[in-house]
Amino acid sequence: MDIIIKNGTIVTADGISPADLGIKDGKIAQIGGTFGPAGRTIDASGRYVFPGGIDVHTHVETVSFNTQSADTFATATVAAACGGTTTIVDFCQQDRGHSLREAVAKWDGMAGGKSAIDYGYHIIVLDPTDSVIEELEVLPDLGITSFKVFMAYRGMNMIDDVTLLRTLDKAAKTGSLVMVHAENGDAADYLRDKFVADGKTAPIYHALSRPPRVEAEATARALALAEIVNAPIYIVHLTCEESFDELMRAKARGVHALAETCTQYLYLTKDDLERPDFEGAKYVFTPPPRTKKDQEILWNALRNGVLETVSSDHCSWLFEGHKDRGRNDFRAIPNGAPGVEERLMMVYQGVNEGRISLTQFVELVATRPAKVFGMFPEKGTVAVGSDADIVLWDPEAEMVIEQSAMHNAMDYSSYEGHKIKGVPKTVLLRGKVIVDEGTYVGAPTDGQFRKRRKYKQ
């Protein structure tokens, strides 16, 4: 064996069992039994042995609001690794007038040889011409089997219902999954412009201009369109009770509907946008955070298996230099917040609080993402033959989240001051230790592009 991990407690979505495991050639080669000599033995006494986290919603090196986000693939993926995530699926954005394959080539140039962990792409379809819709048929051959469209941001990302129907229909026939940002963009634009005309320009009006009904209306419409063409659909960052109700109604009708939520919607509320000294701008992301009641709805949905995953929606806009552009007009605040490093630690607090079980935690942050997005069982579990993407987790370790302890390129954490119990200590990527007792020891060439299998209904 190359590495033996001894005395740990293996936790998968299916169960919990104390067992030693052996790693050979980047794969889990043996669980339990007697082991021969190894190049290295790691003592995992008192620690859980989790599969590496999988974050299927990140925006790295994204360009919006006439600027580029702070994190590069190098910094974002080191942060992810230190938080216990060993694979991300990033949003690769098509440029208008260009093909989807050109977008892939652009992202390859940004990520190739510069990623500390494994990575894949969803493609954001911004310019859905006839030729682009036809491209959906060939992208699965490149290992890209998911696409994202927006029902918001007219003039930037927003597509109409006919285009959404065509995209859903074509993707379903080619084994791909369409991910939808569900907000009624026209309603949101109308409300935000009305607020500004009335002199209401503070960050809180970002949330007030995108109320739950704006999200729920688009969610209901997207689900209905998927139903019309009998296509699977994945609603990204579901935030509120009204949208959840629409999801449940669609499921009851037999719609093949999946949905995620994100860490920020479990812990932050719209009240955070009213923090003094323009601090509320840090919490301007879309959809906006909601209420404590909505948080309870989301936690219950996670516990009951209705929501598929918890992602980060990591998008690294600095407070100074990005967010502060909107001091006089909330519409100029770049939408998004960091979170790829904090995700596992924050979701794990749900275990401590009795909201979800230990196995459900693994299901939400690793196993289900791998299954939905075509990476299981190579990733997302601890099993013989799987990639040795492993996190040794100390359930008793405590910390207070501070940006100074994070590994990204940011100047704040969305979860600054949160008290945490349970942290990743050692992280392995395909059998290589990349985080050793909290210290990053990997290299920017460790990560590999991950081809994903077609989606199966």
Curated annotation (Swiss-Prot):
Q: Name one GO cellular component term.
A: cytosol
Task: Name the cofactor(s).
Answer: Zn(2+)
The EC number on file is 3.5.2.-
Residues binding substrate: Y153, T286, N335
Q: Which residues bind Zn(2+) 1 per the record?
A: H57, H59, K148, D313
> How many and how are cofactors bound here?
Binds 2 Zn(2+) ions per subunit.
Quote the SUPFAM superfamilies the UniProt record gives.
Answer: Composite domain of metallo-dependent hydrolases, Metallo-dependent hydrolases
Ordered alphabetically, the record's keywords are:
Hydrolase, Metal-binding, Phosphoprotein, Zinc
Give an example GO molecular function: metal ion binding
PTM-bearing positions, type N6-carboxylysine: K148
EC category: hydrolase
Phosphoserine is found on S69
**InterPro entries linked:** Amidohydro-rel, Hydantoinase/dihydroPyrase, Metal-dep_hydrolase_composite, Metal_Hydrolase, Metallo-dep_Hydrolases_sf, Urease_alpha_N_dom
- Per UniProt, Zn(2+) 2 binds at K148, H181, H237
Q: What does UniProt say on post-translational modification here?
A: Carboxylation allows a single lysine to coordinate two zinc ions.
- What family is it from? Belongs to the metallo-dependent hydrolases superfamily. Hydantoinase/dihydropyrimidinase family.
**Subunit arrangement?**
Homotetramer.
Q: What does this protein do?
A: Catalyzes the stereospecific hydrolysis of the cyclic amide bond of D-hydantoin derivatives.
Please report the name of this protein according to its UniProt entry. D-hydantoinase
What species is given as this protein's source?
Rhizobium radiobacter
